[in-house]
């Protein structure tokens, strides 16, 4: 067993050996056979020595004192530790080598003696295989058994007993009668339930243990309870708090940000060639932004997000016509089938199963059946119609998919409502702050009040609110849609009320008005019928395309021997805006980038910046002049703009990437 036990032994022993039969006769009191048949029966023993029958009586309310407070009885004939048979029990050195102990047991054999004494002993007992063969092991076990229920405080993981100092404890027990059974066998049944089994380290008989029983006449002493960690110091780490941390974070999701009007998990198809579907945490806020994150944790930390501006986007559902956005509180009944199925592939097999969004319901009837290839990393998703897409004004597309029809329709309804709300209040925050300035409002009003700007440049509709920057004209909202279809290389459309208007753009619009532009773009329109406010869209579109795209009504070039590029250089040097606009309308990109002769190497942009004319500089850039060009001296247009101290020209050149040599 190998355990070191400190105990007190105070038995009243009465041993009587039968000289004739070689056994001990029982006394008048009830007897009990202890250790008659145990595993130590096969150990080497002297022939004359036989197992002893003992009668142990312990007085009631017996308080034991420490061994140093007691004196040895005078009637003690000899020291029990000097007995060769007890030498292995009462060792002075409890850590004596086991081999030496076994050798001593084999050599020291003595005959039985007759004695009847009382001992008051306290010693360190080293229980091992050699100790198990000693004659006084029975008394030792009995004494230790009486001591254990009162002194055990805790039990280690390896089931090792630890008895505190005996001086600090006292005990009182009733009279215990250990009797011997008449049939010859015996066990310590009265105390077996109080003795915890200790694993033995012996290799000879590893299965030896005290047999447990349930019928115990003496009450079982309660073991000391382990202190719980409920009252531990707050300085240490609390694992329960750490486990509950994610739950506490759920209460503060999105703290410090706008509360989403709808949020949840959706599948999103990647834009790569693999076209895999991955789970995303999607939020829809009242600011007109649809944001998706890789996970809920990223949303809580507000990292790795991507936003979609719904103000310039639309939503589409496969197989359905776009419907008007309704209130978010109005229930929408989903159709059983939208008539369109599409084979798509998905990402991880388990990614289809996820928690639904907060404001959507889940129908178990509409859940797709589990795929037989769910354990694979990728599999094809067949005929899934719970998807929708968002298309931006630039043509970019985002594909999303919900778990059910109801959830998809709830997302579509919420997004459509937000798109409508964004369009109704589509003034940008920057334009709002600028329009609050009285000076800018007066500048825009002055542009509208200029000659010819009170009517649309193409259909004569009153009070136009839209403009074409490179043409320098104002137009109605219907004609502005047609101008958008021409492309930005022909017409750059902006709103007077919704877009930003920096100083250089306001100067361009103030320099070119509708009458000046029509004198150039409609210079040869004699005999043509110009559309009016009541004309159809087809008639307006036909006129606009003929006027700006085909240039059928463009005024002719002046008769001169100079090339168009040289004429443009001269018009720029003379700051002749009308002639420059006419030349730019007729010219090509090569002619616009023509340089001055005589080894100067200056382009029209160099000349415009030397003059500090931001209107001509801006028009030249819009018509394709090279902002990176250098003259014969290696100077860029920005160098001449700095020499002219024209901050407007400097801002325009830096905006379009002209190299800044001063940096």
UniProtKB/Swiss-Prot annotation:
<keyword id="KW-0862">Zinc</keyword>
<dbReference type="InterPro" id="IPR002110">
    <property type="entry name" value="Ankyrin_rpt"/>
</dbReference>
<keyword id="KW-0863">Zinc-finger</keyword>
<dbReference type="Pfam" id="PF12796">
    <property type="entry name" value="Ank_2"/>
</dbReference>
<feature type="compositionally biased region" description="Polar residues">
    <location>
        <begin position="203"/>
        <end position="216"/>
    </location>
</feature>
<keyword id="KW-0677">Repeat</keyword>
<dbReference type="GO" id="GO:0003924">
    <property type="term" value="F:GTPase activity"/>
</dbReference>
<feature type="region of interest" description="Disordered">
    <location>
        <begin position="231"/>
        <end position="255"/>
    </location>
</feature>
<comment type="similarity">
    <text>Belongs to the centaurin gamma-like family.</text>
</comment>
<keyword id="KW-0040">ANK repeat</keyword>
<dbReference type="InterPro" id="IPR036770">
    <property type="entry name" value="Ankyrin_rpt-contain_sf"/>
</dbReference>
<dbReference type="InterPro" id="IPR001164">
    <property type="entry name" value="ArfGAP_dom"/>
</dbReference>
<dbReference type="InterPro" id="IPR038508">
    <property type="entry name" value="ArfGAP_dom_sf"/>
</dbReference>
<feature type="repeat" description="ANK 1">
    <location>
        <begin position="600"/>
        <end position="629"/>
    </location>
</feature>
<dbReference type="InterPro" id="IPR037278">
    <property type="entry name" value="ARFGAP/RecO"/>
</dbReference>
<keyword id="KW-0479">Metal-binding</keyword>
<feature type="region of interest" description="Disordered">
    <location>
        <begin position="185"/>
        <end position="216"/>
    </location>
</feature>
<dbReference type="GO" id="GO:0005096">
    <property type="term" value="F:GTPase activator activity"/>
</dbReference>
<keyword id="KW-0343">GTPase activation</keyword>
<feature type="zinc finger region" description="C4-type">
    <location>
        <begin position="456"/>
        <end position="479"/>
    </location>
</feature>
<feature type="repeat" description="ANK 2">
    <location>
        <begin position="633"/>
        <end position="662"/>
    </location>
</feature>
<feature type="region of interest" description="Disordered">
    <location>
        <begin position="359"/>
        <end position="381"/>
    </location>
</feature>
<dbReference type="InterPro" id="IPR011993">
    <property type="entry name" value="PH-like_dom_sf"/>
</dbReference>
<feature type="domain" description="PH">
    <location>
        <begin position="259"/>
        <end position="420"/>
    </location>
</feature>
<protein>
    <recommendedName>
        <fullName>Arf-GAP with GTPase, ANK repeat and PH domain-containing protein 6</fullName>
    </recommendedName>
</protein>
<feature type="compositionally biased region" description="Basic and acidic residues">
    <location>
        <begin position="235"/>
        <end position="250"/>
    </location>
</feature>
<feature type="domain" description="Arf-GAP">
    <location>
        <begin position="441"/>
        <end position="561"/>
    </location>
</feature>
<dbReference type="Pfam" id="PF01412">
    <property type="entry name" value="ArfGap"/>
</dbReference>
<dbReference type="InterPro" id="IPR051282">
    <property type="entry name" value="Arf-GAP_GTPase_ANK_PH"/>
</dbReference>
<comment type="function">
    <text>Putative GTPase-activating protein.</text>
</comment>
<feature type="compositionally biased region" description="Low complexity">
    <location>
        <begin position="188"/>
        <end position="202"/>
    </location>
</feature>
<dbReference type="InterPro" id="IPR001849">
    <property type="entry name" value="PH_domain"/>
</dbReference>
<dbReference type="GO" id="GO:0008270">
    <property type="term" value="F:zinc ion binding"/>
</dbReference>
């Amino acid at each position: 067993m190998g355990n070191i036990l400190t105990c007190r032994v105070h038995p009243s022993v009465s041993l009587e050996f039968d000289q004739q039969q070689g056994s001990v006769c029982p006394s008048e009191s009830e007897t009990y056979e202890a250790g008659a048949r145990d595993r130590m029966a096969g150990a080497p023993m002297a022939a004359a020595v036989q197992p002893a029958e003992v009668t142990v009586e312990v007085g009631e309310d017996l308080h034991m004192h420490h061994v140093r407070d007691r004196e040895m009885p005078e009637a003690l004939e000899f020291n029990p530790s000097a007995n060769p048979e007890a030498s292995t029990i009462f060792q002075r050195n409890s850590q004596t080598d086991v081999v030496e102990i076994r050798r001593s047991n084999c050599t020291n054999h003595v005959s039985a003696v007759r004695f009847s004494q009382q001992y008051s002993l306290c010693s360190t007992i080293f229980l091992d295989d050699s100790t198990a063969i000693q004659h006084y092991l029975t008394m030792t076990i009995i004494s230790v058994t009486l001591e254990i229920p009162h002194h055990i405080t805790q039990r280690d993981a390896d089931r090792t007993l630890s008895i505190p100092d005996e001086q600090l404890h006292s005990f009182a027990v009733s009279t215990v009668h250990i009797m011997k059974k008449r049939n010859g066998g015996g066990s310590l049944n009265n105390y077996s339930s109080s003795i915890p089994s200790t694993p033995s380290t012996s290799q000879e008989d590893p299965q030896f243990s005290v047999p447990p029983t349930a019928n115990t006449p003496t009450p079982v002493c309660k073991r000391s309870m382990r202190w719980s960690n409920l009252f531990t110091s707050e300085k240490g780490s609390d694992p329960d708090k750490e486990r509950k941390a994610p739950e506490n974070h759920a209460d503060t999701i999105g703290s410090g940000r706008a509360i989403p009007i709808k949020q949840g998990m959706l599948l999103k198809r990647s834009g790569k060639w693999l076209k895999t579907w991955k789970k995303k945490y999607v939020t829809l806020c009242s600011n007109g932004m649809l944001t998706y994150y890789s996970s809920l944790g990223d949303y809580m930390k507000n990292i790795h997000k991507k936003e979609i501006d719904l103000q310039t986007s639309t939503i589409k559902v496969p197989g359905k016509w776009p419907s008007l956005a309704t209130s978010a509180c109005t229930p929408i009944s989903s159709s059983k089938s939208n008539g369109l199925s599409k084979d798509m592939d998905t990402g991880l097999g388990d990614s289809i199963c996820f928690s639904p969004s907060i404001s959507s319901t889940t129908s178990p009837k509409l859940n797709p059946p589990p795929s037989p290839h769910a354990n694979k990393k990728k599999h094809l998703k067949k005929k899934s119609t719970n998807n929708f897409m968002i298309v931006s004004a630039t043509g970019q597309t985002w594909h999303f998919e919900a778990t059910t029809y109801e959830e998809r329709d709830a997302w579509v309804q919420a997004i459509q409502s937000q798109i409508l709300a964004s369009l109704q209040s589509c003034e940008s925050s920057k334009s709002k702050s600028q329009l609050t300035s009285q000076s800018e409002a007066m500048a825009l009003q002055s542009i509208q009040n200029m000659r010819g700007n009170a009517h649309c440049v193409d259909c004569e509709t009153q009070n136009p609110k839209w403009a074409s920057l490179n043409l320098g004209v104002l137009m109605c909202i219907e004609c502005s849609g047609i101008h958008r279809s021409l492309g930005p290389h022909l017409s750059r459309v902006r709103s007077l009320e919704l877009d930003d208007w920096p100083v250089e753009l306001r100067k361009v619009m103030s320099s070119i008005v509708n009458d000046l532009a029509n004198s150039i773009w409609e210079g040869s329109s004699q005999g043509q019928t110009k559309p009016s406010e009541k004309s159809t869209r087809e008639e307006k579109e036909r006129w606009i395309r003929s006027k700006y795209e085909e240039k059928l009504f463009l005024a002719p070039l002046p008769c001169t021997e100079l090339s168009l590029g040289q004429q443009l250089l001269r018009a720029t040097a003379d700051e002749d805006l009308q002639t420059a606009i006419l030349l730019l309308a007729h010219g090509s990109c090569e002619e616009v980038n023509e340089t001055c002769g005589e080894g100067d190497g200056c382009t029209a942009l160099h000349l415009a910046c030397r003059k500090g004319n931001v209107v001509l500089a801006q028009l030249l850039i819009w018509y394709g002049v090279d902002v990176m060009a250098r003259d014969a001296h290696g100077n860029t247009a920005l160098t001449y703009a700095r020499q002219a101290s024209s901050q407007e020209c400097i801002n325009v050149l830096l905006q379009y990437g002209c190299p800044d040599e001063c940096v």
